[in-house]
Regions:
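Alpha-helical transmembrane segments of multi-pass membrane transporters/translocases
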Residues: 23, 67-68, 194-261, 265-271, ...
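Transmembrane helix boundary and interhelical loop/hinge segments in multi-pass membrane proteins
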Residues: 68-90, 338-341, 370-393
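A structural motif at transmembrane helix-loop-helix junctions in multipass membrane proteins
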Residues: 18-21, 135-173, 314, 431-434, ...
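Alpha-helical transmembrane segments and their short interhelical loops
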Residues: 100-152, 210, 403-455, 515-516
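Transmembrane helix segments
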Residues: 25, 32-38, 155-190, 325-331, ...
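Aromatic- and glycine-rich beta-strand/loop motifs that create alpha-glucan
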Residues: 1-26, 30, 236-248, 255, ...
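Short hydrophobic, aromatic-rich alpha-helical segments embedded in or entering the lipid bilayer
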Residues: 1-7, 177-207, 294-297, 479-508
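Long, hydrophobic alpha-helical segments
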Residues: 54-77, 315, 354-380
């Protein structure tokens, strides 16, 4: 049973080949693209680590990101299946062991990819230390992912929790500046990072950094195993019911009225109604009013649906507060040069590093949360969206309802992020600064809407997580130099990032070029997302129209309806499928 669960879990993970590609590609991108930037950031925060040692830490962080999300999706998507397997076999242990082993295989694959990238990037000075520490980090985050998967029911909420834990762990708990405050020590990655960067200096007391790392790994793993066993173990009544056999739950006898003999049905007069419709279009004003009604109904239904998910809105409120406040609090107040633009004037100003970090972390939090919201809102309602299209809604009306929810989530995270950042600095121009932050959030929300149908939830989440950090966190930052890196010009947040910095730290008018760049990128992403959404759930007019032969509707004595006519089958009742080959020109029968 255990081997079967492992095999099926890995095959299910590999059902989308992109998942396997990203399992290897994400650690490689994080190590290759961010290790140098993180080394510069660490020097900026007065760290004592050498760049090579800090690059070793990026391998652990990359493995943690992939392993945590892989462990979460392994559990959240198979809870019902695992419970049924445990009920059929009478034992939950093989199922739990198989699920955990499959998650461990994915963690080992992510660890191997991160270590190979580290060797290619800078080499490994101490292979034993690096391999063991990165593996411990992967185990810690697999346990976190599994634990979150057993505690939450919504994939969106769980993905947000795992992603935010990882980002807080990297930006706050890892101790990039070489510090080890009380706040940083409560994060799981702090002590393994100290081991990876050779900064162990008895911060962990007599147990040591290695001891605390092992305590984190063993403790979280034990909690994850216990929780997974609890939710997988079949309920008592589910285990007793199969033993009772058919006597416990006798099958219900269902008799179709149409299968009864003719003598069983008392003859009665039947009412025959023939309804035909023409193909003439409705009046323009009536069609316009119906379109507005459907658009409002789609928006109202989407808001009501996600309004019930109170945990989501709590996360959207709490996460920016924690992320921005903790990141800014750990940043020193030293001055640094920042290149700014005020109208036609280009100048360099000396600004506190804490102010810059608070401003930029607000945009990172907004981008990440809005992107995840866009991804899960679209992918979580595909079947319902298709039903709405069959009911007569146009794909653009359905998409508009989803975009209303996504825009609300993006606006909420933006407002909260700006409010928290305002506790650390006061922007020179609130409107350009807030508008730029909102543009970045909406841009990443559209990226989530675009990626969801193309890559699936897990693949899209990997891409959004990496892109938000690489683009907003490092591609548009001025914390390493006085101006953003040149390679960031090819990423989506360049226009909004420049507007954000100029609005936060200069008093001149915004540059029209960057504003047009941000709006143009948002418009292009929205158009692309609409096309992908329509291709996924949209249907042609012929598919939405149910042609029927010219027949009559007979109301039977039992209150059922039956087609009469030369093409009606004897057993055909209302609700059966029409012949798709029938011609629309012959009319349509309304039921």
């Amino acid at each position: 049973m255990t081997a079967l669960v492992i095999r099926r879990a890995l095959l299910d993970y590999a059902r989308r080949p992109l998942n396997l590609v990203l399992l290897v590609a994400v650690p490689v991108v994080i190590v290759m693209a961010l290790s140098g930037e993180l080394a510069a950031f660490s020097k900026l925060l007065s760290t004592t680590s050498s760049p090579t040692h800090l690059e070793a830490a990026t391998a652990g962080w990359a493995a943690a990101a992939v392993a945590g999300l892989a462990g979460f999706f392994e559990v959240i998507g198979s809870r019902t299946t695992d419970r049924r397997l445990a009920a059929d076999s009478g034992r939950a242990t093989p199922v739990v062991a198989g699920r955990l082993a499959a998650s461990a295989v994915l963690a080992v694959a992510a660890t191997a990819a991160a270590l190979v990238a580290l060797v290619a990037r800078s080499g490994i000075n101490d292979p034993l230390r690096a391999i063991s520490a990165v593996l411990v980090v992967a185990i810690i985050y697999v346990a976190i992912g599994v634990l979150v998967g057993t505690l939450v029911r919504s994939e969106m909420n769980g993905a947000l929790v795992v992603s935010v834990i990882w980002m807080l762990d990297v930006f706050v708990g890892a101790g990039l500046g070489g510090g080890s405050s009380v706040i940083t020590r409560v994060f799981p990655l702090h002590f393994p990072t100290m081991v990876l960067t050779s900064q162990a200096a008895h911060r962990g007391g007599p147990i040591g950094d290695v001891g605390w790392s092992l305590i984190w790994a063993i403790g979280l793993s034990a909690l994850a195993v216990a929780r997974l066993a609890v939710i997988t173990r079949p309920a008592r009544h589910a285990a007793i019911a199969p033993a009772l056999g058919e006597a416990a739950t006798p099958p219900r006898q269902t008799v179709s009225p149409l299968s009864l003999p003719a003598a069983a049905v008392t003859p009665a007069p039947s009412l025959t109604v023939t309804v035909t419709t023409s193909d003439a279009p409705f009046a323009a004003n009536r069609a316009h009013a119906r379109s507005e009604t459907r658009l409002a109904a789609a928006l109202r239904a989407a808001m009501r649906d996600y309004g019930r998910n109170r945990v989501l809105w709590v996360l959207l409120l709490v996460v920016p507060v924690l992320f921005v406040a903790l990141a800014a609090e750990q940043t020193p107040t030293k001055l640094m040069p920042v290149a700014l633009v005020a109208g036609a004037r280009h100048f360099t100003a000396m600004i506190s590093l804490r102010h810059v970090h608070a401003a930029e972390m607000a945009s990172v939090a907004s981008a990440l949360l809005a992107g995840i919201a866009g991804l899960f809102v679209v992918t979580g309602s595909a079947e319902g969206d298709r039903r709405l299209v069959l009911a007569g809604f146009r794909p653009r009306q359905v998409l508009a309802g989803h975009l209303g929810v996504i825009a609300g989530a993006a606006a909420l995270t933006t407002v909260v992020s700006l409010a928290v950042s305002a506790a650390f600095f006061s922007p020179h121009q609130w409107v350009p600064y807030a508008g730029a932050d909102l543009l970045i959030a909406l841009t990443y929300a559209m990226i989530g809407v675009l990626l969801g149908p193309l890559t699936g939830r897990l693949g899209g989440l990997y891409l959004i997580l990496v892109l938000a950090i690489v683009d907003v966190g490092y591609g548009q930052t001025v914390m390493f130099k006085s101006f953003p890196p040149s390679w960031g010009a090819f990423l989506p947040a360049r226009g909004g990032g420049r507007l954000l910095l100029d609005g936060a730290f200069s008093s001149g008018s915004a540059q029209i070029g960057y504003l047009l760049l941000a709006l143009g990128g948002l418009g292009a992403l929205t158009a692309a997302a609409a096309l992908v959404f329509k291709a996924r759930i949209g249907m042609s007019r012929a598919q939405r129209t149910i042609p029927a032969p010219p027949s009559a509707v007979e109301v039977t004595p039992l209150g059922l309806t039956r087609l009469t006519g030369p093409l009606a089958a004897p057993e055909q009742t209302c609700g059966a499928k029409w012949d798709p080959g029938a011609r629309k020109s012959e009319g349509r029968t309304e039921r």
